Amino acid sequence: MKIVFSTKNVSRATFLDTCCYAFDYGFEGFEIYDAIKERSTHHDSILRQYRISDAKRKLLNRNLAVSALRMPDSLESGNTTADLVEKYVDMAASSGIANIIVRIDKEVSFDVLEEKISGAVKKAEQAEISILFETMGYLADTEKVIGIINHFSSAAIGAS
């Protein structure tokens, strides 16, 4: 996928409107920022179990794809729990979205990372979903990203 945008600062009334926006401006797709909010805001969201096939048709008809689900809070945040990360993996898997993007804003111990994402990594491996660490801020240092990838030793972990 070449050109995509994040829905973080894009406000559209429906999932279809977001698809039309992407198509009209020549994007090849978009990443969904804050999947929980997306699912509750858009009645026609690809993240709603009973709307997946309809939403996929909206994407397919415009030659678009959802490239990733992006978590709004960093992993070290109190708002990000192990259950939430696993929920993102489940939503991505059921919706046919290949990637989840997470971030770390400051140094955190591997114990905290294990607590927050080890269950999600196992689920992601089984569902062939990639958990990608955003390489900016604290993780702009390539060695730090490689350290995380090596720590988990999983094909489900990568960098964005």
Regions found by a protein language model. Give the residues of each.
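N-terminal pre-domain/capping segments
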Residues: 1-98, 154
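Structural detector of well-ordered beta-strand residues that form the stable sheet scaffold
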Residues: 4, 67, 101, 132, ...
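A generic short-segment signal for beta-strand/edge and adjacent turn/coil regions
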Residues: 35-38, 81, 100-102, 113-114, ...
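Short, small-residue-enriched loops and turns at beta-alpha junctions
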Residues: 38, 73-78, 106-110, 137-141
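Active-site-adjacent beta->alpha loops and helix N-cap segments on the catalytic face
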Residues: 39-41, 46-53, 108-118, 142-143
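Active-site groove signature of glycoside hydrolases
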Residues: 92-111, 127, 132-136
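Acidic/histidine-rich catalytic cores of soluble enzymes
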Residues: 115, 119-160
